[in-house]
Amino acid sequence: MAFSHIPVLLNEVLEGLNIKSNGIYVDATFGRGGHSKKILERLDENGRLYGLDRDLAAVEAAKAIEDSRFTIVHSAFSNLKEVCTNLGILGKVDGILMDIGVSSPQIDDPSRGFSFEKDGPLDMRMDQSSSLTAKTIVNTYSKQDLAYIFKVYGEENFAAKVATAIVRQREIKPFETTLELSEFIKRVIGGKPTPKHKATRCFQALRIAVNAELDE
């Protein structure tokens, strides 16, 4: 499945980096390479660009950039210091770019399990090599832990109610898909229709928990 993605604030990013043609730069959240490709256009043969991403799909997409000045590394941006040390560029980098958060291709691909509006597996892993999925959390975590995740990570006012209902329902049948869970949460919360889907906060909370985003 192919996705098109327009890089955020592209001109502002390039201006902020104040790119030197022979400089060393790091795109710590490579994504689909929109920013990286533009940075490369401003580098001469002595310039270097290193891309980082925890998403294996992003690392695979980076292979399309056949440029000796560019290197892709499968890593979260939280490991930036270690990566720079291993690459021998610690203290030599002229600029670093971070576009933090879930990316459009991740949300748009139902198979990644981030969307509460498109059916897919309860996954939500930004790094597919990690073992913890949303399905594991939803079907195995205690009522107290689920309530904590929904309340603290999602600021969900009905955290305890949703957690209690999930634990009760999964005893009958484990949750398997995103739409199954989102529609269930919608029914549990109830009330009048709202512009924002009622599962939004719980899905955000699960994504943060799966990817340990607050530890990044």
Question: Could you say what each language-model-derived stretch is?
Answer:
Residues 1-216:
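S-adenosyl-L-methionine-dependent methyltransferase catalytic core, i.e., the SAM/SAH-binding region
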